């Protein structure tokens, strides 16, 4: 039996999967649905001193979810080929835009009605209750004590998106820390500058954890049939989330993990159990999910939980903590190598689909029939540049680097 339980900043959770602060946690009823669908911690949608004026439309899938992908088609026994298709299936959505801002409901409504309601539900079911607030130091100092009194286990705080100066984050953290006694978590932007120095300064003001990252932007997507932007923010801009954000957020998580012992909650582009594993390997102690739930529904949390357990069992791990930080030892400041190293082909795994041949820009990989009639990938070592693209698309990991 795999153990998914964690503890962050003294808060015990039955599993590390949480929702991110967004419309799926806009009130007590939606937060109860999140709890019923298996989250280990629930995060209430961000509030501030004044209700937001939210542009409409406020959310949209980029390119209507159309993504070019490939499936394996068996033409005859031993003859498997890659076949391109276009699909609007939610599993292939690559990006999502929002112009949501924070909640357009007054903070007093949450403090008086929503938080007490969901707090009791959390206590009954052993789920941690986080509240997200923003944005300026004086606003956090005002809201923080009220949120603590309303029963939050911890506070996640955001600042408005920063440029080259991270001091607003530290100033906000200091103001909140001086006003509450419960754990506080600083939510970082994808392009937060100088993360090592920032997390050290956050440690000095006694922040209890990091959340990485927020959405990225401004971003624009245009409906070519109408010429209009897909969301209704100023200039048509929104903020991007979804799978396209994951590599950026992972980099922030890893850089923070190399710089601090504070727990880090990874956010951005999680749609599968392996994404949870990836964030943990980068140093995360928990994860948050929003976009996948907006598109797939609340059941996504249980699916991702199940996939996480299955992966851990298959790979012989007994706890989610066993994989935490495993990738950090490979994240070195120098390049892995600067010379061509051709990949190897495991003939037992190769199914001859031809994906490696299709993506090779150096004409170095070809699928050929072997003596027994089986189609196999063959690497021409004299042409191979060692770029690695073929290894990243192989569905069976047959073509690989021997490190």
Q: What is each residue range found by the language model?
A:
Residues 29, 53-58, 107-117, 121, ...:
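Active-site-adjacent beta->alpha loops and helix N-cap segments on the catalytic face
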Residues 69-167:
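Active-site beta->alpha loop and helix N-cap motifs at the rims of alpha/beta catalytic domains
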Residues 355-372, 378, 389-403:
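Iron-sulfur cluster-binding cysteine motifs and their immediate structural context
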């Amino acid at each position: 039996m795999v153990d998914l339980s964690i503890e962050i900043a003294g808060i015990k959770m039955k599993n590390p999967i949480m929702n991110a602060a967004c419309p799926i946690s806009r009130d007590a009823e939606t937060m109860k649905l999140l709890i019923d669908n298996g989250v280990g911690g629930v995060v209430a949608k961000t509030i501030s001193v004044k209700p937001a004026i939210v542009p409409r439309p406020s959310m949209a899938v980029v390119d209507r979810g159309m993504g070019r992908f490939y499936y394996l088609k068996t033409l005859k026994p031993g003859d498997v080929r890659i076949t391109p298709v276009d699909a609007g299936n939610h599993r292939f959505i690559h990006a999502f835009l929002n112009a949501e801002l924070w909640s357009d409901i007054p903070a007093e409504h949450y403090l008086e009605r929503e938080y007490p309601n969901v707090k009791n539900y959390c206590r009954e079911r052993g789920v941690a209750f986080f509240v997200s607030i923003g944005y300026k130091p004086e606003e956090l100092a005002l809201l923080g004590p009220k949120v603590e009194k309303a029963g939050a286990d911890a506070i996640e705080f955001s600042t408005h998106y920063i440029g080259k100066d991270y001091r607003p984050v530290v100033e906000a953290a200091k103001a909140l820390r001086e006003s509450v006694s419960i754990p506080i978590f600083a939510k970082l932007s994808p392009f937060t500058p100088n993360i090592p120095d920032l997390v050290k300064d956050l440690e000095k003001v006694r922040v209890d954890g990091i959340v990485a990252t927020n959405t990225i932007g401004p971003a624009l997507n245009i409906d070519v049939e109408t010429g209009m932007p897909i969301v209704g923010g100023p200039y048509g801009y929104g903020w991007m989330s979804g799978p396209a954000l994951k590599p950026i957020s992972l980099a922030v998580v890893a850089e923070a993990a190399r710089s601090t012992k504070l727990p880090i909650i990874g956010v951005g582009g999680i749609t599968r159990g392996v994404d949870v594993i990836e964030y943990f390997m980068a140093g995360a102690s928990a994860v948050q999910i929003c976009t996948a739930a907006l598109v797939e529904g609340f059941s996504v949390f249980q699916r991702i939980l199940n996939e996480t357990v299955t992966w851990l069992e298959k790979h012989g791990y007994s706890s989610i903590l066993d994989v935490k930080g495993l990738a950090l030892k490979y994240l070195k400041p120098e390049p892995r190598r600067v010379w061509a190293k051709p990949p190897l082909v495991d003939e037992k795994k190769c199914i001859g689909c031809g994906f490696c041949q299709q993506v090779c820009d150096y004409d170095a990989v070809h699928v050929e029939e072997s003596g027994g009639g089986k189609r196999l990938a063959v690497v021409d070592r004299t042409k191979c540049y060692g770029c690695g693209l073929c290894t990243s698309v192989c569905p069976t990991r047959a073509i690989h680097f021997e490190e």
